[in-house]
Amino acid sequence: MSAIHLPDTQNSADTRQIIIDKVGIKDITHPITYIDCDGNKIPTIGIFTMTVSLSERVKGTHMSRFIEILNEGPCEFSAHNFDKIIDKVRKRLESDIAHITLNFTFFRRKKAPSSGVESMMDYQVTLYGTLNKDEVQVMMKVVVPVTSLCPCSKSISKYGAHNQRSHITIKAKAAKDKTLHIEDLIDLAERKASCELYAILKRDDEKVVTERAYDNPAFVEDLVRDIAVDLNADDKISYYRLESENFESIHNHSAYALIENQKC
């Protein structure tokens, strides 16, 4: 039986002569494994946006090739290897520039501060990668939920102080020849907060975290400034964008602060 010839419309010439900056697939869900700083393999679900630049001479890109790359696997990522899949996309799609954004939930086992009960804490992570010919740029973003306690409320109240959950978001780029781990950013944010969060707390743990937060009050301004001090001093980091959003327990709005620094 002879093969049927099917026209390759997307690979035909385009006469409008306009370059497309980004074209590809957005928000495709795929299972992945993330390898943490200790080498532990953490299975999770990734949401990918994968794009390339498109020449002014070509009508369309090869959409199916993006998904083929994911299906070929292995979809194992770490702080060391995210650039490999970006390079694979650029070469397979025959493009000068490739972009990948990967969102996933990162899980970390934590022990409660008094009882020692272990539970899994979740953090939202985004990896950003761009490869322009042979120049690669990779950044990571992590959202760290913490507790913040108001210094003003503590200073004026007899019986306690209002506190709330806050999200500290750190987007950072590693300096040349340096490795930056997700855990580095999580540890920093939790260390500077009034108190960190846990999935499970027994009564003695709840006493510890309540008192710890009371002993470490912080405005939203304090949170970003304290974290920025360490980010500025960290030679592993060449750029960062730092945000804190406090979901105020006594208001129907959030308090917010941002610091951004292109160090080098």
UniProtKB/Swiss-Prot annotation:
Reaction(s) this enzyme catalyzes, per UniProt: GTP + H2O = 7,8-dihydroneopterin 3'-triphosphate + formate + H(+)
Pathway: Cofactor biosynthesis; 7,8-dihydroneopterin triphosphate biosynthesis; 7,8-dihydroneopterin triphosphate from GTP: step 1/1
Keywords, sorted A to Z: Hydrolase
Enzyme class: hydrolase
An annotated GO BP: tetrahydrofolate biosynthetic process
EC number: 3.5.4.16
Gene Ontology MF term list: GTP cyclohydrolase I activity
Hydrolase in keyword set: yes
Function: Converts GTP to 7,8-dihydroneopterin triphosphate.
Protein name: GTP cyclohydrolase FolE2
